[in-house]
Amino acid sequence: MFRLPLQCVLWGCLLSSVHPEPPTACREKQYLINSQCCSLCQPGWKLVNDCTEVTETECLPCGKGEFLDTWNRETHCHQHKYCDPNLGLRVQQEGTSVTDNICVCKEGRHCTSKACESCVLYHSCSPGFGVKQIATGVSDTICEPCPVGFFSNVSSAFEKCRPWTRCETKGLAEQQAGTDKTDAVCGPQNRLRLLVVIPIMLGILFAILLVLVFIKKVDRKPQDKAPCTKQIPQEIDDLPGPNPTPPVQETLHGCQPVAQEDGKESRISVQERQ
């Protein structure tokens, strides 16, 4: 009864040794083909023939301008990338049999995508704006407006805003303040003083002239002058008579003496008597 199972086991072992079971997985850097684990071609080499039971995998190196950068079973190598100068590209690093060409943009340009298949010119910051961040091979220029005290008078993709000139540090005077597009204008100190002193002197002279004109007009106005009288003493003769003649007042016209004719009596107006 026990012979039959034992015979089956023996026959199974015999068959498995004559016809081994094909492998289901291969080691690292191998590939499975035709129930065989064949070695992969090393980087920089391409596959020519798969391995057999009696031969190893056959590989050949990539030609000039070609590369393969991994262990592979590729039958063709990859072509190096072409850095087209018409698209603004240039070769930064030549490729080898295991590396590709590295393309970058020419000076003053940046890539339009991560793959960097073409380039465009940097954006320039216009006057009144300065460069906050200079463009790189993969990013464009970032501009910012010039703050107070700084200016930019050119369109540039590299220049930042520059500070206004400090005239006092050069022994000069500021004649015109700067703007976001222009620098401060400096000049000699003497000129600035003249610009200040001359208007002041002209103002003083004008005021003096006005005073003189006013005084002259006041002098020309007619003045009401009271008649001047002058007491003229006269000697009284010790002549006999009932009524001696009193002293005669000489009336002055405009403070000038007026002669009285002989034989005429001096008369005093009624108002003066009152």
Curated annotation (Swiss-Prot):
GO terms for molecular function: signaling receptor activity; ubiquitin protein ligase binding. Residues 224-274 are annotated as: Disordered. This is Tumor necrosis factor receptor superfamily member 5. Residues 1-20 form the signal peptide. It comes from Callithrix jacchus. Coiled coil: none annotated. It is a single-pass type I membrane protein. Its main location: membrane. Keywords: Disulfide bond, Glycoprotein, Immunity, Membrane, Receptor, Repeat, Signal, Transmembrane, Transmembrane helix. Monomer and homodimer. Interacts with TRAF1, TRAF2, TRAF3, TRAF5 and TRAF6. Interacts with TRAF6 and MAP3K8; the interaction is required for ERK activation. The chain crosses the membrane at residues 195-215. The keyword Transit peptide does not apply. Receptor for TNFSF5/CD40LG. Transduces TRAF6- and MAP3K8-mediated signals that activate ERK in macrophages and B cells, leading to induction of immunoglobulin secretion. PANTHER family: TUMOR NECROSIS FACTOR RECEPTOR SUPERFAMILY MEMBER 5. It is found in: Membrane. Pfam families: TNFR_c6 (PF00020). InterPro entries: TNFR/NGFR_Cys_rich_reg, TNFR_5, TNFRSF5, TNFRSF5_N. SUPFAM superfamilies: TNF receptor-like. Residues 261-274 have a biased composition (Basic and acidic residues).
